[in-house]
Amino acid sequence: MKFKILIKIFTVLILTTFIIQCSGSKKVADISKEEKEVFNQKDKDTVIIKNDSLEYKIIIMEIGFNTWLQSIAQPRGYYTQEFMENRNRIFVINWNQRVLEPMRFDPNLYELQINYEPFIDYGYEVNYQLYNYFIYFQRKYNQRLGPFAPRIK
């Protein structure tokens, strides 16, 4: 009899611990003063991501992104293309899912789907800029497009 009570108490404790751990706030990594200034920019900023040899182009019209890319993002060569491709796949899947759910996610943030095919080699530059846009976007708007926190360092 006591054994059954102990099992019930243990089960309740485990479930409570699990719920508390899972419901914790998932905040974006700390934002520096310099990064906040870039996020608060008002100047128009357009970045065109393209790979001339493969004829792929992405146009990002996001105020502050180009400045952030030049001043805060990790430099080219810091990440491998494979790393960025893997992260971009996860980010794109989550992004596109949010585009399809405008009642659940802000349709002003998630306007258009991204066509990113996993078996196409878009090249380093396209992956670099797309990856960094996802990091910028998550940090600026306090969003999570994957299971990992969007960090710079």
Predicted segments, located by residue:
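Bacterial Sec-dependent N-terminal signal peptides
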Residues: 1-31
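Sec-dependent signal peptide cleavage junction
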Residues: 22-61, 65-66
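Generic structural "secondary-structure junction" signal
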Residues: 60, 85, 116-118
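Acidic/histidine-rich, surface-exposed loop or edge segments in extracytoplasmic proteins
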Residues: 67-81
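Extracytoplasmic/periplasmic, Sec-exported soluble proteins
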Residues: 80-87, 125
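Solvent-exposed, polar/charged alpha-helical surfaces in well-ordered, non-transmembrane soluble domains
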Residues: 85, 89, 93-97
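Compact alpha-helical subdomains of small soluble proteins
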Residues: 98, 102-153
